[in-house]
Amino acid sequence: PGGVIRSLKNFLFLKHAHRLLLAPSAEQPDRPSLDILPYILMPLIDGKELAKVDLEDQESLPEACQLVDENKPREKDSALRLMLVECLLLLCTSHYGRQSLRERGAYIVVREAHLAEPKEQITEAIVRLVNLLKRDESDASMKDDQDVHVSVEGEDADDDLVIEEL
């Protein structure tokens, strides 16, 4: 599963692909798309924790994530959990991605995952994600062409590409 998640994560660096990879928003239901969100959220869901969430909040989740068996555990591999959160962070680099995650209950899943997460690196990534999901969207930030830079693990600054004025 790690190779698939890593490939998906690499693909999510292409902001223009976010509209294709997420189900259409309520505003544009006729737009063709895939729906990767359930595949990203499902490993982050713990069935017992989800059962305690309000029914109204559960209904905002993608359909595949709503009726989860109470015995379903969260992904055990911390490296995979981190990559999944980073995938969500990359989706937040476009306005469409942020709106889709908000409308489809991603916050509910990461909120519960944050409470149970023992690894500090993953909790920090979740906090960055929550800050992007909960921030106020001004008119200036609502444009898809405006860049939101999100740093993810493994993204190192290449000193050879830095131009310095002398």
Per-range role (PLM):
Residues 2-6, 28-35, 75-83, 105, ...:
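Residues within HEAT/ARM-like alpha-solenoid scaffolds
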Residues 26, 32, 37-49, 69-74, ...:
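HEAT/HEAT-like alpha-solenoid repeats
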Residues 43-79, 122, 133:
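Acidic, Ser/Thr- and Gly/Pro-rich intrinsically disordered linkers and low-complexity segments
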Residues 163-166:
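A positional/structural detector of protein chain ends, strongest at the extreme C-terminus
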